[in-house]
Amino acid sequence: MTTLAIDFGNTRVKFGLFEGGELETSCSVLAGDAQKLFAELQERVNLHKVVFCATGNSKDFVTFLKKRGLSYEVVDAGTPVPYTNLYKTPETLGLDRKVLMVTAFKEFSGVNTLVIDAGTCVTYDFKNKEDAYLGGAIAPGLQMRFKAMHHFTAKLPNLEASGDPVELIGADTYSAMQSGVINGLIAEIDGLIDRYKLEYDELKIILTGGDGLFLSDRLKNGIFADSNFLLKGLNYLVEFKRT
């Protein structure tokens, strides 16, 4: 059975094709190009199931799916999950965070697991070795930090993260902003990981999201980078509903 998993984020949309439960291929496009890519996939692949999770504004895309006449499943607050959810306000839990924990449960059952999703925001989500989801944290993402400095000041430029090595001490405004955002976020992530390690033994750390690969080589803590962690969770949900 071929399943298409769609992660509709705030700026990008990620597609993953699963065959027999295994991820065959994945790709990511800007939200404005999602309809075109879906139409191309539908022409090339015989889709049996489409599962969809949206954290961004997906109204136009949902309308597009309905016009294509293809049935699909939408993950929402009421979608059942295979783990114990101890979040105090489950109705406000981001759908991306909810799905990420499905993958954590399936792949690391019985293990203390921290999933860090570095996207528009950086989210930290934790499940204990009893497979209970406790919650986590939400912080501004890499690009949001640059945009915030530009938006809330009169003269700071609107920058993007540099792929070059970032010095600790910025010798000009450009490099000072790069250091503040990139080194600051790295220190924040490493610091939170260290605090989790103090409280939970044998901690498995997963890093995913659009900026996950950018950050993975810069962190001092050992992490497992998996850019498809959320797509896997969507496919696991399809399998879970069949059982």
Descriptions of predicted regions:
Residues 125-126:
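Amphipathic coiled-coil signal-relay and dimerization helices
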